[in-house]
Amino acid sequence: MFGGLAAAVAIVFFVTAHEAGHFLAAKAVGMKATQFFFGFGPKIWSVQKGETEYGFKWLPLGGYVRIVGMSPMEEVSPADAGRTYREKKFWEKSFVLLAGVGTNFLLAFGIFYGVGVADGAPGGPTTEVGMVSEASAAAAAGLRPGDVIVAVGGSETPKWADVEAALQTAGPGPNAVRVDRDGELLTFDVNLTASETHAGAGFLGVTPTIGRVDIGPVEGVGYAGRLVWDGAVSTLEAIFRMVRPSSLAQYFGVFLGDTDVPGEIRPVSPIGVVSIGTQAESATFFFTILALVNVILATINLLPLFPLDGGHFAVAIYEKVTGRQADARRLLPIAAVVIGLFAFLGFVAIILDLTNPINL
């Protein structure tokens, strides 16, 4: 319960931090921002402070800052002359546009760095049992998570690779498995089943815990940077999988009640992130998920698709290179398609997270 609440608060904070990046950057270069909202759709609550309205809207799928002159179709009041987005220099526009994603990338980097230095990096599998599969040979014999496998069939197993080798040698059938349980050596008679992936090997039905490797403060910089990069690449790969025609066809099926969507193409809404947060069994896993949320937010917004931040940045580059203002008549259809696509994926994600929650 606490994990879910913490995840919900964190999502609001990360989206707000993203928009605050835009907002503060706009203020720094003299642009006028009239709205700062979390969410989209009908307004829940707002308050006017100075020239900016702050508030919340019903659909928790992001947020926005409205900067005068940023919309190509907006009519600008003469009173705002000199404070509009379109009047500013290229570097000022770029600073404002990239401040949001920069904030999220920095948050992700900071979280990854903190987790890495405090708890280390994932190492290789250990001989400690992390999970026991239901209806497996290990479960029937009485093995538990936390048991350390010392030997299988008379062969000592100081490493997980030794456990796998011993199971390969033992094959299906009765065998003795010795474990260390809280300092006490116990021997279990286990009736190993046949492995479905390794011919001739015995199958115990346990997964190992993953060890941790210590990381120093200096090493943590490179470690966190690699995780941010890997997360961004994985996000792009996931997006490309989601927009394939076969994937989109499956998403349409969700509206007809078919919620059996494969994990590799399943979109996740903030509701799903909160659900994952409630299932987090360690602080390391919980904070890693929060870091990835920031990477995903930043990477999606960097896509060169109008009206995302990356799309606005692409337009700013075009105008800088050509010396001409972008044609609003061409930008608006692109914006309509992009908004429609993300709204569609967002609704699919919400339906899936409500009707077929993610179970870790």
Task: Describe the predicted segments one by one.
Residues 2-79, 293, 300-322:
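Small-residue-rich helix-interface/hinge motifs
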Residues 110-118, 298, 302, 346-353:
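Hydrophobic membrane-targeting alpha-helices
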